[in-house]
């Protein structure tokens, strides 16, 4: 049978190296080396023997005696480094070929090519970062939403870890109290014990739910708000899309049915990611391809968050307009009614349109041919439908694993609250909640914490 523990230990003892900067040409590339042999490799690369930790040196870089580059190098002595091991950084000129050659020189001198995320894994296993900080560092790299940056930076600093540890300590105190009362059942349970425990549980559950609700809302925001542009043929849908993109993305033509499929683009409006979906004109059509496009248009309405219903202000309402309004009413989605072509004499019966619509809506008169003015007006209207999230001083769950662990912890605390009259069951659910919280930061043996916690309690407390 394979010894997994031994294999992991051998792998963790390896000295690893990798290029830390993205592929491509730039001002600099960074090669990182981590492990017990990192300093020795750096000495051989530079033909220099003395390095003071945390000092930057400009050194020639050699491979088999051949000069490769003049680079900036820094040595971080264990345990005062990102991984907790000896770490060396080589900041060379930003040629991909040069960086690869220096990396290959590191490998020739005994380093192993690092696996994806292995530097962070070393940091975690060497207790330099916990799971929540690892998650935050990944999401910070991937983040496209400015409003989330502060929450991720605070999580990287360790604020989520502090929040979870405080909650865990509170639950351990409750668990210790209940265990004492179980072991000494002849002692009378204090009359205010159950009331105090119930209050503390409610308070803890509420704080967890607040974190969970904010994280779920932010997750939806990160996906982007889906905005479908619908209307009858030639109402100006594609012109509207082009105006919002400030480019000719969709084909504009006087011929009905030009747009036969949905076109999707992503833009940013007032700090929010918006997925724009231009749809085929909604009408009755005998053309099979156009009909399939119309079906996709209707499907997009089911999955979108906001609808832009485009009407031609220069023409009276027609059957296709009323069919569109029937469709909008069925979706029950918030809608911005865009009255296009306001540069022409208005003929659309606005009061009839207002009375016909039964959904939340706002009205915007515009001219899609004036792209900048149209975009400015639309941005303001669309932003009114965005949910207002207060991101200041908020913590954030950044993965499905974290969300699931907290959801399970909440369920266990609710179960504990419903079993206050049976301390054995109460203790079981509190312990399960603690074990789920462990998954958010760092798993450890709860019994060790309990031993420490129990030592602070006296009989009757």
Curated annotation (Swiss-Prot):
MF terms in GO: GTP binding; GTPase activity; metal ion binding
InterPro entries given in the database record: G_TrmE, GTP-bd, GTP-bd_TrmE_N, GTPase_MnmE, MnmE_dom2, MnmE_helical, P-loop_NTPase, Small_GTP-bd
Q: Which residues bind GTP?
A: 234-239, 253-259, 278-281
Query: What's a single GO BP term from this record?
Result: tRNA wobble uridine modification
Positions bound to (6S)-5-formyl-5,6,7,8-tetrahydrofolate: 32, 89, 128, 461
Q: Where does Mg(2+) bind?
A: 238, 259
Its chief place of residence is cytoplasm
Q: What class of enzyme is it?
A: hydrolase
Q: Where is the TrmE-type G domain?
A: 224-387
Q: How is the cofactor bound?
A: Binds 1 potassium ion per subunit.
Per UniProt, K(+) binds at 234, 253, 255, 258
Which subcellular locations apply to this protein? Answer: Cytoplasm
Cellular component GO terms, alphabetical: cytosol
Assigned EC number: 3.6.-.-
Q: Which cofactor does it need?
A: K(+)
Q: Any idea which UniProt keywords this protein has? A: Cytoplasm, GTP-binding, Hydrolase, Magnesium, Metal-binding, Nucleotide-binding, Potassium, tRNA processing
Subunit composition and interactions:
Homodimer. Heterotetramer of two MnmE and two MnmG subunits.
Q: Which family does it belong to?
A: Belongs to the TRAFAC class TrmE-Era-EngA-EngB-Septin-like GTPase superfamily. TrmE GTPase family.
Job description of the protein = Exhibits a very high intrinsic GTPase hydrolysis rate. Involved in the addition of a carboxymethylaminomethyl (cmnm) group at the wobble position (U34) of certain tRNAs, forming tRNA-cmnm(5)s(2)U34.
NCBIfam families hit by this protein: mnmE_trmE_thdF (TIGR00450), small_GTP (TIGR00231)
List, alphabetically, the PANTHER family matched. Answer: TRNA MODIFICATION GTPASE GTPBP3 (PTHR42714), TRNA MODIFICATION GTPASE GTPBP3, MITOCHONDRIAL (PTHR42714:SF2)
The protein, known as: tRNA modification GTPase MnmE
Question: What's the encoding gene here?
Answer: mnmE
